[in-house]
């Protein structure tokens, strides 16, 4: 099943988001400006496009794995969220995770990828306890960060 996605090209000199290979989940987003990121620096980078995510779906902005592995370029709030009601330009909050080498991003470079997925929109129902709501206890309970172990330091 194929869903269409309305895309407005805000910068006519940049390519539309595109898949590198047939069947890829994400479409590449391009930088609309030149950016220099020093070690540890971050910048909000425009992509020159706006999209209309359909109701009941969400756009998720992910780092490009090759850039993360090769030069340490990532996204601060990964994945970034593009809600169905948002109609502005997609911007990506990039960060240079390398501690010693600056990263130069050129206008037109692929900087991130957009995935569009269906999302549940549950109605929130306040309860005083999970027992009252008829929700069974779990073996995890309220165990949070590090509660499952799996690393020598935990």
UniProtKB/Swiss-Prot annotation:
Q: Which InterPro entries match?
A: dUTPase, dUTPase-like, dUTPase-like_sf, dUTPase_trimeric
Does the record carry tRNA-binding as a key word?
A: no
- The source's domain of life comes to Bacteria
Q: Name one GO molecular function term.
A: dUTP diphosphatase activity
Keywords, A to Z, come to: Hydrolase, Magnesium, Metal-binding, Nucleotide metabolism
The record ties this protein, via Pfam families, to: dUTPase
User: What reaction(s) does this enzyme catalyze?
Assistant: dUTP + H2O = dUMP + diphosphate + H(+)
Q: Does the keyword Metal-binding apply?
A: yes
Q: What is its EC number?
A: 3.6.1.23
This protein's pathway? Pyrimidine metabolism; dUMP biosynthesis; dUMP from dCTP (dUTP route): step 2/2
Going by the record, the broad EC class of this enzyme is hydrolase
Please list the cofactors this protein needs.
Answer: Mg(2+)
GO biological process entries: dUMP biosynthetic process; dUTP catabolic process
* Positions with a binding annotation for substrate: 64-66, 77, 81-83, 91
Further facts:
Each trimer binds three substrate molecules. The ligands are bound between subunits, and for each substrate molecule, residues from adjacent subunits contribute to the binding interactions.
Query: What this chain does, per the record?
Result: This enzyme is involved in nucleotide metabolism: it produces dUMP, the immediate precursor of thymidine nucleotides and it decreases the intracellular concentration of dUTP so that uracil cannot be incorporated into DNA.
Self-association or partners: how does it assemble? Homotrimer.
Q: Of which family is this protein a member?
A: Belongs to the dUTPase family.
Name of the protein in its database record: Deoxyuridine 5'-triphosphate nucleotidohydrolase
Gene source species: Mycolicibacterium gilvum (strain PYR-GCK)
């Amino acid at each position: 099943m194929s869903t269409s996605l309305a895309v407005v090209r805000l910068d006519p000199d940049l390519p539309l988001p595109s898949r590198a290979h047939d069947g890829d989940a994400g479409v590449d987003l391009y930088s609309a400006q030149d950016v220099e990121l020093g070690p540890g620096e971050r910048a909000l980078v425009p992509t020159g496009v706006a999209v209309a995510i359909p109701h009941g779906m969400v756009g998720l902005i992910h780092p490009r794995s090759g850039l993360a592995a090769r030069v340490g370029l990532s996204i601060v709030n990964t994945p970034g969220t593009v809600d169905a009601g948002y109609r502005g330009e997609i911007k990506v909050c990039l960060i240079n995770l390398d501690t010693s080498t600056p990263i130069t991003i050129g206008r037109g470079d692929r900087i991130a990828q957009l995935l569009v997925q269906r999302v549940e929109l549950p109605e929130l129902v306040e309860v005083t306890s999970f027992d009252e709501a008829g929700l069974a206890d779990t073996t995890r309970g309220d165990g949070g960060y590090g509660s499952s172990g799996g690393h020598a330091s935990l």
